């Protein structure tokens, strides 16, 4: 677990209004999404029925955007920067959105299904080569845009998949540059179906007592970072549908003590605190995909919970480390680390976010951390918001070990642990024991 910190600031523009188009969705992506089409009666239509049945064709999927053609005033659109709703140049009806430079309109659509496919379409025309953009962002993935430079109205679309924790998206029409006008009209957002991302490995922690030893092994003893705790298996267990990792104050002799030793692991005569670190080492590893973990942290001083991965080949840090979540010193961290020219000395791509900025009561709830990983790029998200990302073109090991290799182009294994004190955990003077780190589920999709 790394702890070099570099501040990352998220910037945004414009104000948004939010429209809830359904009663909401449970963010538990294990719930199936029906692959059916609704008939006028509200019953599901059997897709295997003959097309020429004599019945009228089914209605098209509902448009989830409210006031998509700007016919009913500005609401719920947020029109900003000099863009305006005009009674001319409409594709259909009477009204359209007119944009010029660095202005546009946006709308937040809520009530979407997580891990599902949607299509955003719209009509646009332009009087210059400076593009008009109709796009979508803040849905749990890359911002996507359709580009319009033509003088006549043309329809275009983008298709996107919502994140595992995301039930909303921001749609917009925007012109970035130039002074000549462009127009947008008849935007449409429709549900296309469930995502094709397949669940390939998971633990829902639905049992009681000991963990599934076909999925997990344990770290033991004093392990790293001069942390206070002694890791032992009995501090990790299933309870009430969750993984509990418990830090305890308990004292006994250190079985590895060596009198006169200068190694911090063996110089300690006594174990004063215990905790657990569970790992999929020798059980499961994967290369590329989407890791999703729902967990709850306390943000207490002296604690250092983490969700992280290590590459299966080469020594640290040249095997690659991904800190999907670390929590210490009042911050949430998201880090990538790889090897340099000096042994045991990592190159860090780090970000940290003060828990206080997330608002009151944040630690009372569970939250969803994601690591999206492919051969080109990695992204870490918290509740759908990007905390850190990295291009794999920049994560090449130096000469110390596995020189010239990319440690993020090999399988990785998962670790979940609760450290106490140490280099980053800080003072435990005000910490009450036992203290718990809770994990609801771990899922890997490909």
Region spans (language model):
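Secreted/luminal cysteine- and crosslink-motif detector
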Residues: 14, 116-117, 123, 315, ...
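Ser/Thr-rich, Pro/Gly/Ala-heavy low-complexity intrinsically disordered linkers and tails
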Residues: 10-60
């Amino acid at each position: 677990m790394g702890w070099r910190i570099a501040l990352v600031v998220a910037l945004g523009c414009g104000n948004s209004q939010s429209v809830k188009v359904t009663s909401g969705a449970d963010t538990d992506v294990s719930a199936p999404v029906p692959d059916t089409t609704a008939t006028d009666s509200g019953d599901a239509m059997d897709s295997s029925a003959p097309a020429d049945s004599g019945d009228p064709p089914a209605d098209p999927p509902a448009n989830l955007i409210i006031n998509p053609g700007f016919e009913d005033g500005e609401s719920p659109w947020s029109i900003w920067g000099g863009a305006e709703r005009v009674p001319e140049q409409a594709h259909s009806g009477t009204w359209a959105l007119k944009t010029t430079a660095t202005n546009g309109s946006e709308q937040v659509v809520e009530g979407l299904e997580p891990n599902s496919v949607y299509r955003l379409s719209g009509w646009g025309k332009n009087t210059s080569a400076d593009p008009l953009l109709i796009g979508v962002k803040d849905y749990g993935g890359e911002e996507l845009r359709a580009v319009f430079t033509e003088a006549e109205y043309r329809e275009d679309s983008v298709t996107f998949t919502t994140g595992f924790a995301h039930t909303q998206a921001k749609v917009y029409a925007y012109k970035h540059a130039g002074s000549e006008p462009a127009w947008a009209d008849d935007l449409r957002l429709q549900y296309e179906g469930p995502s094709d991302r397949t669940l390939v490995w998971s633990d829902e922690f639905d049992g009681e007592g000991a963990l599934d030893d076909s999925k997990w092994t344990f770290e033991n003893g004093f392990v790293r970072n001069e942390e206070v705790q002694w890791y032992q298996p009995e501090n990790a267990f299933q309870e009430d549908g969750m993984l509990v990792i418990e830090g305890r104050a308990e004292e006994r002799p250190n079985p590895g003590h060596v009198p006169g030793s200068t190694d911090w692991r063996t110089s300690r005569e006594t174990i004063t605190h215990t905790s657990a670190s569970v790992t999929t080492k020798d059980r499961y590893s994967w290369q590329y995909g989407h890791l999703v973990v729902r967990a709850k942290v306390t943000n207490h001083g002296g604690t250092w919970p983490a969700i992280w991965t290590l590459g299966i080949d080469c020594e640290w840090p040249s095997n690659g480390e991904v800190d999907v979540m670390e929590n210490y010193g009042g911050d949430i961290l998201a880090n990538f680390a790889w090897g340099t020219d000096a042994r045991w000395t990592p190159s860090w791509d780090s970000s940290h976010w003060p828990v206080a900025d997330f608002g009151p009561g944040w630690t009372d709830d569970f939250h969803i951390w994601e690591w999206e990983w492919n051969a080109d790029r990695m992204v870490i998200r918290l509740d759908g918001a990007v905390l850190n990302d990295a291009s794999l073109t920049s994560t090449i090991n130096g000469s110390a070990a596995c020189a010239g290799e990319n440690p993020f182009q090999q399988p990785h294994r998962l670790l979940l642990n609760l450290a106490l004190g140490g280099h980053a955990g800080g003072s435990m003077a005000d910490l009450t024991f036992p203290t718990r780190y809770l994990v609801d589920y771990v899922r890997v999709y490909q």
